[in-house]
């Protein structure tokens, strides 16, 4: 009961932060909460399950739920353009999933390249899709503990790289301004640009991860 009470209080604090200017700590907590929901949704879509301690609390509500819904819909658009890009991410990176440092280092390498030329919401969505793709790979290979590490790693990357950008835009709710097209024949320019670059990010990250000879 105490765990459930603390989880409920934590969830309430996260959602409350959407109603005012968030601190960096709150932005990171929100990033991780969104990451857990994003990963959970992608695992369900793949017919897989994962138990996150924080998910003992009620499903996100209010603005947090809206942000999560938009992130997932934008992620759907990204993945519909080229479905293979965000699948079998571990195989594309040529990494084993038994080592937490290898998995998190690979994720951070890809994340660093995604944002090497600046920050956009398209790239943020891509970051979440990469994390979810790796999470699916981990669960399929009986490494569910790696998912927790990925979510923590995502939060740390947001703290170091995205928090200032997010704060200047008033927080995660800024993504609600993004237009999600319901026309399957239309794809926003920023989505296409993100996808065109992502293959290069994977290749660059692969070479960064090669052992020194």
UniProtKB/Swiss-Prot annotation:
Membrane topology term: Single-pass membrane protein
GO cellular component, one term: mitochondrial membrane
GO molecular function, one term: protein homodimerization activity
Modified residues (Phosphoserine): 7
Cross-link (Glycyl lysine isopeptide (Lys-Gly) (interchain with G-Cter in ubiquitin)): 25, 32, 160, 177
Transmembrane spans: 190-210
UniProt effect for mutating residue 177 to R: Increases protein expression and stability. Increases apoptosis
One Pfam family matching this protein: Bcl-2
Annotated compartments: Mitochondrion membrane; Endoplasmic reticulum membrane; Mitochondrion inner membrane; Cytoplasm
Keyword Membrane part of the UniProt annotation: yes
Region (Nuclear export signal): 71-79
Motif (BH4): 32-44
Record note on what altering residue 78 to Q does: No change in apoptosis induction
Location (main, coarse): mitochondrion
Tissues/organs with expression: Widely expressed. Highly expressed in brain, kidney, and spleen.
Processing and modification events after translation: Ubiquitinated by AMFR/gp78 E3 ubiquitin ligase complex; mediates degradation by ubiquitin-proteasome pathway in a VCP/p97-dependent manner; prevents from proapoptotic activity; promotes degradation of newly synthesized proteins that are not ITPR1 associated.
Cited CDD domains: Bcl-2_like
Keyword field: Apoptosis, Cytoplasm, Endoplasmic reticulum, Endosome, Golgi apparatus, Isopeptide bond, Membrane, Mitochondrion, Mitochondrion inner membrane, Mitochondrion outer membrane, Nucleus, Phosphoprotein, Transmembrane, Transmembrane helix, Ubl conjugation
Other remarks in the entry: 'Matador' means killer in Spanish.
Written domain comment of the UniProt record: BH4 domain mediates interaction with ITPR1.
Subunit structure: Monomer; positively regulates apoptotic process. Homodimer. Heterodimer. Oligomer; promoted by apoptotic stimuli and BH3-only proteins; mediates constitutive activation. Interacts (via BH4 domain) with ITPR1; enhances BOK expression and stabilization; limits apoptosis and prevents ubiquitination and then degradation; protects ITPR1 from proteolysis by CASP3 during apoptosis. Interacts with ITPR2 and ITPR3; binds most strongly to ITPR2, and barely to ITPR3; regulates their expression. Interacts with XPO1; translocates to the cytoplasm. Interacts with BNIP3; promotes oligomerization.
Protein name in the entry: Bcl-2-related ovarian killer protein
Organism of derivation: Mus musculus
């Amino acid at each position: 009961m105490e765990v459930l009470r603390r989880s409920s209080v934590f969830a309430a604090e996260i959602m409350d932060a959407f109603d005012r200017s968030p601190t960096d700590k709150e932005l990171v907590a929100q990033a991780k909460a969104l990451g857990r929901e994003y990963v959970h949704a992608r695992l369900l879509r793949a017919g897989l399950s994962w138990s996150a301690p924080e998910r003992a609390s009620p499903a996100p509500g209010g603005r947090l739920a809206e942000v999560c819904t938009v992130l997932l819909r934008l992620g759907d658009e990204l993945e519909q353009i080229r479905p293979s890009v965000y699948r079998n991410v571990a195989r594309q990176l040529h990494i084993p999933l038994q080592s937490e440092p290898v998995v998190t280092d690979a994720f951070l390498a890809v994340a660093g390249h995604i944002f090497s030329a600046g920050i956009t919401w398209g790239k943020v969505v891509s970051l979440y899709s990469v994390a979810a793709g790796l999470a699916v790979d981990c669960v399929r290979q009986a490494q569910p503990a790696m998912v927790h590490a990925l979510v923590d790693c995502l939060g740390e990357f947001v703290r170091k790289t995205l928090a200032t950008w997010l704060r200047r835009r008033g927080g995660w709710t800024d993504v609600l301004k993004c237009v999600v097209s319901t026309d399957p024949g239309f794809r926003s320019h920023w989505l296409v640009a993100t996808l065109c670059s992502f293959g290069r990010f994977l290749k660059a990250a692969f070479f960064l991860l090669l052992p020194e000879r």
